[in-house]
Amino acid sequence: MSKKLSLVLFLGVINFSFAQTKSLQPTTGLNFPFVDLVNSTGGGIVFPLQLLFILTIITLSPAFLVLMTSFLRIAIVLDFIRRALSLQQSPPNQLIMGLALFLTLFTMWPTFNIIYKDAYVPLKDSKIGFNEFYDRGIAPLRNFMYKQMSNSKHEEIRLFMSISNYSRPKNFSEVPTHVLIASFVLHELKVAFKMGILIFLPFIVIDIIVAAVLMAMGMIMLPPVMISLPFKLMLFVMVDGWTLITSGLVKSFM
């Protein structure tokens, strides 16, 4: 008797649950930008190519952030500061990456604003297709990357064009995007390392002076880094190092 009663109660709970689920189903789809998750017949959730496109963009956003924006140069230079000061975990990596991200937003904001107005808004309003959206969205980034390489006379572009066995382009529009990205990454590495040399020089002088003084005093077993660290921090604070580095990084993209 108890088994039959338990079975009846179990079936009743399941029936009630299905009824509640059916009554709580939404009648409208999720409102994502230019993505319709409910088909026109109201038959349930579908996954169109637009959703796949959004997921692809989200997946590739870290690579996009590193390879096509100012993030690479800023992150490397900020890491060089920590190494030049002989600091191991201060500031922590999360803080350095967070500061690099915000500085990237400041330097890239005009470019992102153009992409938003010329590419995203027309696509959201269904005025353009995805092909035109890509062309309009990639154009400001191409201009930004090409402008940053103007100081090196675009040597990196010529290098990767020759590696790819492409003919010499007549103008900027004939440079393939993947060649431009690779050239931009190489250029950013070169610029970041040049800035790193300038950052390291004054602190190397302090290390040499401290090491020479310790040698003259016969204190060979005492690590020079332990003694030079307070002097490095004192120099960095006296010259307002964080402000100088931040302003120098931002101005280097103008």
Whereabouts are the PLM-identified features?
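N-terminal secretory/membrane targeting signals
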Residues: M1-Q20
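Hydrophobic alpha-helical segments and their helix-loop boundaries in membrane
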Residues: Q20-M254
